[in-house]
Amino acid sequence: QPNLWRCEKDEEFVNCAPRCPQNCRNIRSYQPCLVLTPVCAPGCVCRSGKVKNDRGDCVSITDCFK
């Protein structure tokens, strides 16, 4: 992981992060991805089984519905 990327505790660095990753908001109600290019970019993503909540914290998907 390059030094310029400081991922949080529940995140990991990937070379190809999706431009419109799943999060609590788009899991609860469909929202189309409006970012057309590039397809992906390096960055931090939530670890497996977790998504970002409205505050930007990685939480389990079930927590999105609480």
Curated annotation (Swiss-Prot):
GO molecular function: serine-type endopeptidase inhibitor activity
Main location per the UniProt record: secreted
Entry comment describing in which tissues the protein is expressed: Expressed by the venom gland.
Domain of life: Eukaryota
Location of this chain's protein in the cell: Secreted
Pfam family, one: TIL
Keyword Disulfide bond: yes
Metal-binding listed as a keyword: no
Keywords: Disulfide bond, Protease inhibitor, Secreted, Serine protease inhibitor
CDD domains in UniProt: TIL
Cellular component annotations (GO), alphabetically ordered: extracellular region
Protein name in UniProt: Venom peptide CtAPI
Source organism of the structure: Chaerilus tricostatus (Scorpion)
